[in-house]
Curated annotation (Swiss-Prot):
This is Uncharacterized protein BU052. It comes from the Bacteria. PROSITE patterns: RHODANESE_3 (PS50206). Gene3D superfamilies: Rhodanese-like domain. Signal peptide: none annotated. CDD domains: RHOD. InterPro entries: Rhodanese-like_dom (IPR001763), Rhodanese-like_dom_sf (IPR036873). Residues 50-140 form the Rhodanese domain.
Amino acid sequence: MQDVIFFLSKHILLISIWIFCFIAAVFFITRTLLSKSKMINNFQAIKLINQDKAIVVDTRSLESFKEGHILNSINVPLKNIFLGKIKEIEIYKMFPIILVLSDTYKVNACIKKFFEYGFNRVYILKNGLYYWKTDNLPLIVNDK
């Protein structure tokens, strides 16, 4: 027991760092488990689309949307979400929503808005369309 006390007294900084890391890990794990939304990868998104009839909401600009988007996705630019202009997707409140975001720093604010609008099952496509493209998954291109 004296050896433990001696070790602790000589290595205060090391012990402090370990305690900080432990608290941070517990915080992030708890936050992830209690979060209402989840970050999903491409294959989880495909499974949600095929099995649960998830609706893909692409929050990128119309120009980016026309350059390539997921089949049957609905374009609702991020600014419209924050302004409350979501008439196109209000009828889908009972379905899971998969968000395609280009501005990852606005994820939390966007999710909060969707929960305020009454959507209960909101998912975020991890890394937006970047990994969708790198996995060679199909994109629809509109030239109009």
